[in-house]
Amino acid sequence: MNKNDFAKNPPMGWKSWDCYGASVTEKELKQNADYMAEHLKQYGWEYVVCDIQWYEPTADSSHYPKFADLCMDEYGRLIPAENRFPSAKEGKGFKEIADYVHEKGLKFGIHIMRGIPRQAVSANVTIKGTSY
């Protein structure tokens, strides 16, 4: 491996956790994307990431309430909390926000944990495409 095999710069972007903990809203996320597009994109900043707990309607800090009621679809997949991300209503997910960020020439991402949410296990939901 030689020195030219490495990225010249680290990935550059903004994630909601650093400013809002788990409580970011759609409005705040878009405002930060606007700022980044106007002031930072020219310097290589490109990632806008909605961090953890976007699926938790009562998230209001960096504290994680034990056994909070998470927003999930019928298969136990996490979906955005509509009270915090109104454009996600009617099963639209993050599409509108992702389109908004992409139109600014930036890349959108979400934080997601691996595995099946405890709430889905407790509810014994069926995994899509299986009989389990």
Where are these regions (language model features)?
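Aromatic-lined carbohydrate-binding/catalytic grooves of carbohydrate-active enzymes
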Residues: 32, 36-132
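Active-site beta-loop-alpha junctions of metal-dependent nucleic acid enzymes
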Residues: 28
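Mature N-terminal, pre-catalytic/accessory segment of carbohydrate-active enzymes
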Residues: 1-25
